[in-house]
Structures are given as C-alpha cells and as structure tokens.
C-alpha cells in the first residue's frame, strides 16, 4: 500500500468514526416523569388513583419513543415515592435532556374536563405545544391549551421541560375513559408523537 493510499484510507476511517460519534452524541435523552407515586397518590376519584395512571401512560410512552430510537430515562418505574427535587436531579444528570412530567388532573367542579400542558421557558413552550396540538387534535375533549406555570419539577429542571395533564379524573366521563387501556394507548401515542416532533427540531 502506498503512503498516499494509506493516508486516504486513514482519514476516511477517521471521518466515518467522527460522524458516527456525532450521530450518537446527537441523540436527545428524554426523561419521563410519572407524577406522584408511593405515599403520594396524587388525585383520587371514583376509586382511580392518579399515580397509577401516570406510571401506566409513561411506560407506554417509553416503549413508543424507544421504537423511534430515542433514549429514555424514567424517574420511577414502580409505585415508589420520588421527591420533586430528585426528579429534577435525574433530568439534570443528562445534558440537553428533554423532561416530560405526566399527570392526570382533578377539580372540585366535576364538570370540568380537558387536556392541558404547562411549561416554564420558551423552549418548554414549544415542547408543551407540540404535545398539546397532537393530543387536542386526536381526543374529543376540551383543549385547555399550553400555559406557563412555575411547577417545582419545571423550575428545578435545567433543560427543556413540560408537564402534561391528560384529563380530569374528577369528571366522571373522563375518569371512565382514562381508566381504559385503549384510551391510555391513544394518550401515549400522541404524547410520544409530540415529544419526537420536538426532538426532531433540535
């Protein structure tokens, strides 16, 4: 092999390695946060605990994101209590991570229903709107929009963060619907789609 051929082969191999490394590093980590857990039930109406729904939907979203090749970290995988500060710490371990906290809503006025998302920063707003757009476009309920709110998990998280409220379990109709596996599948599909669409803009 001539010196010129060797040098050409070396730099070709080097370039491929650099491109592969860049592609690997470009993968955005998504941190999914199933709200509440353990001693913290969250909302509880008509025998349904929010913490259980949150974890179920988060696990479904995880599967869908991983099928798209998006790496996922969960703040909890079982019915355990995780403090708000520690949830943010988990997200902050991953530079550039996208953090999504999954919840179900409740209100003393049982007629209130709908889906809404929350954010703290301009980038978080884009993430929240991406999920809100898809959820509201697919699900027959009130579109309560994306709003800025100083939730602790959002303010303590350094990266892009949003919180999604998947429906009011205090509303009897939404409670029954959210209690079904097929509906939680739909929620997961649209949340995952919204997250993936946002990640594609990074």
Regions found by a protein language model. Name each.
Residues 27-29, 48, 52-202:
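Active-site-proximal helix/loop segments of hydrolytic enzymes
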Residues 1-4:
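N-terminal secretory signal peptides that target proteins for export/translocation
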Residues 28-47:
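Short glycine-rich His-centered loop
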């Amino acid at each position: 092999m001539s010196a010129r051929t060797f040098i050409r082969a070396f730099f070709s191999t080097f370039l491929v390695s650099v491109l592969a490394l860049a592609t690997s590093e470009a993968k955005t980590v998504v941190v999914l946060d199933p709200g509440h857990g353990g001693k913290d039930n969250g909302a509880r109406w008509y025998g349904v605990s929010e913490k259980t729904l949150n974890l179920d939907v988060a696990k479904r979203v995880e599967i869908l994101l991983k099928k798209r090749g998006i790496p996922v970290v969960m703040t909890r995988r079982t019915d355990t209590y995780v403090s708000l500060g520690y949830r943010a710490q988990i997200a902050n371990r991953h530079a550039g991570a996208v953090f999504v906290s999954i919840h179900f809503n409740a209100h003393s006025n049982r007629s209130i229903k709908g889906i809404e998302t929350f954010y703290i920063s301009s980038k978080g707003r884009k993430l929240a709107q991406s999920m809100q757009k898809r959820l509201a476009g697919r699900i027959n309920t009130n579109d309560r929009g994306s709003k800025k709110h100083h939730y602790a998990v959002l303010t303590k998280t350094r990266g892009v963060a949003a919180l999604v409220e998947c429906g009011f379990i205090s509303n009897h109709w939404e409670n029954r619907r959210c209690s079904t596996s097929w509906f939680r599948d739909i929620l997961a599909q649209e949340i995952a789609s919204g997250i993936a669409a946002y990640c594609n803009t990074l």
